[in-house]
Curated annotation (Swiss-Prot):
It is found in: Cytoplasm; Golgi apparatus; Cytoplasmic vesicle membrane. This is AP-3 complex subunit mu. SUPFAM superfamilies: Second domain of Mu2 adaptin subunit (ap50) of ap2 adaptor, SNARE-like. The gene is AP3M. It comes from Arabidopsis thaliana. Gene3D superfamilies: 3.30.450.60, Mu homology domain, subdomain B.
Length: 415
């Protein structure tokens, strides 16, 4: 049972406090939490569950905002974390994003949503389709009316029609003049390359994202050409488990609008589309650096938005870096970013220059880790392919669209 939820900005300010039970949680717990973060750094915010002297704390971080929940009794931690993730997703969908200004400008709506989503410390209504029938999303007209009439509440006077439905994630009878459904494969490649250039780890985290604009209650079936490569699948509640377990086919009645149908991982990949070859030599207080970036295996689509960033060691007093392609920027916190864009066909992009060490140091003993970024549109590097999307009750003039994209996730090259 959760007793309180706090929303904390990236500067430590408590933007919102929602007491959930009769036992009030003092705000001093947030001061303790922030003091621990200041003393321990980012590693503290990576902990999903924290035992404070007085409470169990559960936290997630989204776009610089910390969602912090408190409880004095033992409870399943995954339930608390999953609920906080659902709160963040709902707020992002309602407000069109997550940042400090949006939450402060829509303070009343955030409170109303939390009132409906949790009751006496237990999750209650978390489906966006039902919440939107209870509480209207903010818009310019509603804000102007609230100023004129003095009524700031967005709560509806009618019971949501989906509350009694067998599929609570979908409105009772949505209607569209044109019936459309879009399927996106969105993948991230996580990789680690050691100092010898060997691929230590390479795997894909992917999501099947959909946008359904279909009339009535469509029953969809989505099948893959090679589902055996998938691991660690997580499904939206609309997915029926039995067809997947028996035939590895996704059978579901979709929510209305955009949603994530499933997530998955594809592990132990043998190759990456881009290579990074860094080299650093140091002598007499000066280091020479050279980094080559090129295409290792052509995916068949253009590799775009290539970037390479690394943190200069603290012992480096100054840096003089340049490249034969793209731009190089060095920030005041010693973060160097090389923006390459696309790799040209006539030359290999190269970053080179010198690093000056602090007085008294002859050689560099701490080497940076290079982080690669890229994006490839039109292909899923995992090799996952959608075979077909069938509708059991086909509406007239149905349009189906499929897309895929892969981008770099945690892609580290160590030296």
């Amino acid at each position: 049972m959760l007793q309180c939820i706090f929303l904390i900005s990236d500067s430590g300010e408590v933007m919102l406090e929602k007491q959930l039970t009769g036992h009030r949680v003092d705000r001093s717990i947030c001061a303790w939490f922030w003091d621990q973060y200041i003393s321990q750094g980012d590693s503290f915010k990576a902990l999903p569950v924290i035992a404070s002297p007085t409470h169990y704390l559960f936290q997630i971080v989204r776009d610089g905002i910390t969602f912090l929940a408190c409880s004095q009794v033992e409870m399943p931690p995954l339930m608390a974390i999953e609920f906080l993730c659902r709160v963040a997703d709902v707020l992002s969908e309602y407000l069109g994003g997550l940042n400090e200004d949006l939450i402060k400008d829509n303070f009343i709506i955030v409170y109303e949503l939390l009132d409906e989503m949790i009751d006496n410390g237990f999750p209650l209504t978390t489906e966006p389709s039902i919440l939107k029938e209870m509480i209207a999303p903010p818009n310019l007209v509603s804000k102007m009316l609230s100023v004129v009439t003095g009524n700031a509440s967005n709560v509806s006077d009618t019971l949501p029609s989906g509350a009694g439905s067998c599929v609570p994630w979908r409105p009772t009878d949505p209607k569209y003049s044109s019936n459309e459904v879009y399927v996106d494969l969105v993948e991230e490649m996580d990789a680690i390359v050691n100092r010898d250039g060997e691929l230590v780890k390479c795997e894909i985290y992917g999501e099947v994202q959909m946008n359904s604009q279909l009339t009535g209650f469509p029953d969809l079936t989505l099948s893959f050409a090679n589902p055996s490569i998938l691991e660690d699948m997580r499904f939206h509640p609309c997915v029926r488990y039995r067809p997947w377990e028996s035939h590895q086919v996704l059978s579901f009645v979709p929510p209305d609008g955009e949603f994530k149908l499933m997530s998955y991982r594809v592990k132990k990949l043998k190759n990456t589309p881009v290579y990074v070859k860094p080299q650093i030599t140091s002598d007499s207080g000066t280091c020479r650096i050279s980094v080559l970036v090129g295409i290792r295996s052509d995916p068949g689509k253009t590799i775009e938005s290539i970037t390479l960033s690394f943190q200069l060691p603290h012992c480096v007093s100054s840096a003089d870096l340049s490249s034969n392609h793209g731009t190089v920027t060095i920030l005041s916190n010693k973060t160097c970013t090389w923006t390459i864009g696309r790799i040209p066909k006539d030359k290999t992009p190269c970053l080179s220059g010198t690093l000056a060490l602090e007085p008294g140091l002859e050689r560099l003993h701490v080497f940076p880790t290079f982080k690669l970024g890229f994006k490839i549109m039109g292909i899923a590097l995992s090799g996952l392919r959608i075979e077909k999307l069938d509708l059991q009750t086909i509406p007239p003039r149905l349009y189906k669209g499929f897309r895929a994209q892969t981008r770099a996730g945690e892609f580290d090259v160590r030296l």
